[in-house]
């Protein structure tokens, strides 16, 4: 793992921020009380429909603080900012002025404050209101399947009403819409669809919109983590959480929305990002007074603590499950999955998988099915897991230890299932003997797809053991395409063929943070033997120390 960027300290998103990053023309005009100039500047950068922009909380607090003469545009700005901060009393005051239309703001307010069992957004006769309400309701109800359908429809929607609104700078809004459409579609695909599509859309989003738009940070981090979910290395500098904590970060509501959109993927990180984001979300939800936002955040705090070794009682899982019984389908998925992760009971995973399927939450479905195949392979799970892996691109299911992924791959191969996804799932499992077994079942099966057999040969080349290299030499004598692929790998003359099985096993455990004593106990060997294996591995890899050897080993695995 080479992801860089330390977590920021806890942040109060309601605390005052300086105005250092605002345009000089805006702050200078305010300093000399030139209110027409201030209004003119604001109309180019302040959008009451999408309040979170390049200047973040600095601009929002400036608009609330500056003593501008009141008019309908300023009231609309401030009413939207009140929604962003959960200032429901302030919102009531702005609505009472009769200077602005209430339906949009009231609809969003009611969605935020809706109970756990809410399953549909407020009704409206206007199409642009229905579309806006559905987005918020999908987010607060975690209705992944419905959200994915919404995200696919959204690019075709063109709101004529924008041209008649003075509180929306149309140029910036149109550029932002292209960015938002790509990011939301990427998020929807990452949670409930195709990871290759999600990665491509996230990459495209990085080129859209204006510079410093926070949605670009979402796209950047999502692209990195989706690539890892597809089997790639986890590398790059993640910046979303630091952006949220900065003065130009998003409003409280916007921060909850964007952090929730990538929350499951924070579980890949071992730096506390998941709990940091979940606790921030809980603080926001409490200040907003949102039952559904608070329930989601509490659930993710429990997930982070369970991943850290805490028991179900310590994280209050029983209370979450009790609340989940009456909740909308999307809100039930993670609590049910957590119950299964704690109990390891196949029946609990089956219930979690059913809930995930109902909500359209593909990531949770893949997780539950992977555990089921590893624990208790049955015909239905053996049929559906490889189909989902192939169609969605998942290779590192969330909340699935590498050893469980390896067991699932072996179970699929032993049951006669063949596919590139199965070979790659075995590879990320990190157990050389399992990868060899799965690869050989594909290579020896003449009925296996050509792409899967080629992937199996490639997997043998990546394992990095003497045994795997011997197998490749044997395969290279074949006269078919498999033999040609083996000869090409052998011709590369890479280092990774020099490690023994035991050296590989010891180095793999060392890179996961185990001490020599821990490894010795795990493998029933002496600490002296472990030290010798590590020394041999370092020498063969040309590594100066244990950490460098672990890093080179990880490169070999990828």
Whereabouts are the PLM-identified features?
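Extended repeat-based scaffolds of very large eukaryotic assembly and lipid-transport proteins
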Residues: 416-455, 459
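Amphipathic alpha-helical scaffolding segments comprising HEAT/armadillo-like alpha-solenoid repeats
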Residues: 36-39, 348, 382, 432-444, ...
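Helix-turn-helix DNA-binding segment
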Residues: 437, 441, 451-454, 488-535, ...
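Residue-level signature for tetratricopeptide repeat
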Residues: 28, 44, 81, 133, ...
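Inter-helical turn/loop elements of alpha-helical hairpins
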Residues: 3-7, 11-121, 133-145, 189-200, ...
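Alpha-helical repeat scaffolds
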Residues: 56-63, 88-99, 116-123, 143-154, ...
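Alpha-solenoid helical repeat architecture
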Residues: 33-37, 70-73, 100-111, 119-132, ...
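Structural detector for internal amphipathic alpha-helices that build alpha-solenoid repeat scaffolds
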Residues: 40-48, 334-342, 367-374, 423-430, ...
